Amino acid sequence: MYLTDHGIREAIYGNNQRDINQILENIIYIELLRRDYKINVGKIGTKEVDFVAKKGSEKIYVQVSYLLASQETIEREFSVLEKIPDNYPKYVVTMDEFNMSRNGIKHMNIRDFLLKDEYN
C-alpha cells in the first residue's frame, strides 16, 4: 500500500527508521504516478522488480534501496535488472551520494532521480 501523505503513515505507524526502504519506495511511487506512469511490480523468476513504469511507448524499471552498504545489497538490486533482456532504462535509486552505475543500469541518488526532467 502506498500513501500520498507521509504524515498519515507517521500517525498510524509512528516514526520507525527501520521502515526507510518502504518510505523511499512510497516517494518514488508517488513521483511516477505524478508523471502519469502506469506502475506495476515486475517478476524475474523468483526476484522482484520494485517498479515497472509505463507511459505510452516509454518504459522504465526502478529498484529502490536505502543504501548500497554491502556487496549483498548491491547484487540484489542490480542483478534482477541485469536479467531483463530489453533496452529500456533501468535505475537503482538510493540515498547514496556516489555513483555505482554498471552494465547500463543507472545508479542515482533519490534527490537526483526526483529532479530529473525525463527518465528515457
Model-derived features: where do they sit?
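A cross-kingdom feature that marks ATP-driven nucleic-acid transaction machinery
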Residues: 1-120
